[in-house]
């Protein structure tokens, strides 16, 4: 649609020479993510060329706004687990040394997913836990149901520190 509009405008404004196709390139949000970026870029360019050729219009300079794709991998948030508590006699909660609401707001605001993993104690036995932030707000938690159906971390041991990390969150988050 945008390319057709470009072709119409190019005919009335011959100096028009650029097209901004916006954003939308996906970013890796889980470890087994596979996406053929090269294919998609080639497909975008070939479709623009095809439509311009069909309309007898020179191909434009193409601009993109792939913000998350461009900078997403540049960011990571590391937290330490400061406490573990049991709720409802069955739910284990690991509490981080910060707040998801202030440092990773998109995890609770729009259920954004990020690559998440333990930083240390990988050789330990793992357990299913919920992750909570330090605020008293009931929304300050990592929604495991939305993100991965379960969060597994090394079992907590008295006197042993545990660190976790969220990765590829360089766009639009606090870092």
Regions flagged by a language model, labelled:
Residues 1, 36, 59:
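Conserved N-terminal phosphate-binding loop of PLP-dependent enzymes in the Aspartate aminotransferase
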Residues 1-18, 27, 52:
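Active-site-proximal beta-alpha core segment in soluble small-molecule metabolic enzymes
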Residues 4-8, 39-50:
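Alpha-helical scaffolding segments of alpha/beta enzyme cores, especially the outer helices
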Residues 17-24, 132-137:
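Short connector loops at secondary-structure junctions
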Residues 19-28, 64-69:
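Glycine-rich beta-strand-to-loop/alpha-helix junction loops that act as flexible
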Residues 29-38:
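Glycine-rich tight-turn/loop motif centered on a GG-T
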Residues 43, 49, 53, 57-175:
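Charged (often Lys/Glu-rich) extended helix/loop segments that serve as interaction or gating elements
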